[in-house]
Regions:
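Flexible, glycine-rich beta-alpha linker
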Residues: 4-5, 25-49
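Hydrophobic "lid"/C-terminal helical patch
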Residues: 58, 86-90, 119, 152, ...
Length: 182
């Protein structure tokens, strides 16, 4: 039940994949992704950009501005796990999908305060202090409309997995990017 034009566009794409699969033109699979954290690269203009920035920028010596309250929860999945999910979706037999070709991937819910606390435990106070709260009502209004918890029993039954915790997500980003901490 999409609540935005963006969500409507995504559902239209999912329906097309399902319909073309039903007609035998392709063997399609549509994955609904949580917010991907920690994305490498630079911040962008997406409302979700802060979710990676509050980790990525401080670990790279740069101040990050967090536009939402510390209590804000984010449903997330790491780049490693999303790559694993795409490979797993490809490798699953067509029969495993049945007639439903759309799947919400598992993820974990982390609040901004939990994420910053994990960053502090891993990289120290000086790094965590680079996260500065600068409220942005426009972004906050968008983010507060996002669900923060999903039940994904079908995905789990098909072998898809979430990250175990935010500490693992942060440590994997540090390892993947070759960042030295402490």
């Amino acid at each position: 039940n999409p609540q935005t034009s963006y969500g409507t566009q995504k559902v239209i794409g999912e329906y097309l994949v399902t319909d073309l699969t039903r007609k035998g033109y392709l063997d399609g699979r549509s994955l609904r992704l949580p917010t991907i954290v920690v994305r490498p690269g630079k911040p962008n203009l997406a409302a979700s950009s802060f979710a990676s920035s509050i980790f990525r920028e401080p670990l790279n010596g740069v101040v990050a501005e967090c536009p939402v309250p510390e209590r804000t929860g984010i449903w997330l999945l790491s780049p490693r796990k999303v790559v694993d999910a795409f490979i797993h979706a490809h490798d699953l037999a067509s029969s495993a999908w049945g007639t439903s070709r759309v799947l919400n991937l598992p993820g974990i819910t982390v609040t901004v305060s939990e994420g910053v606390a994990a960053l502090r435990r891993i990289a120290g106070e000086a790094v965590a202090a680079r996260v500065q709260h600068k409220p942005d009502e426009r972004i906050d209004r968008i983010v507060q409309g996002w669900p923060v918890r999903f039940r994904t029993p079908r995905a789990t039954a098909l072998g898809f997995a979430a990250d175990p915790d935010i500490e693992t997500v942060i440590r994997d980003y540090i390892a993947d990017e070759g960042i030295r901490v402490r």
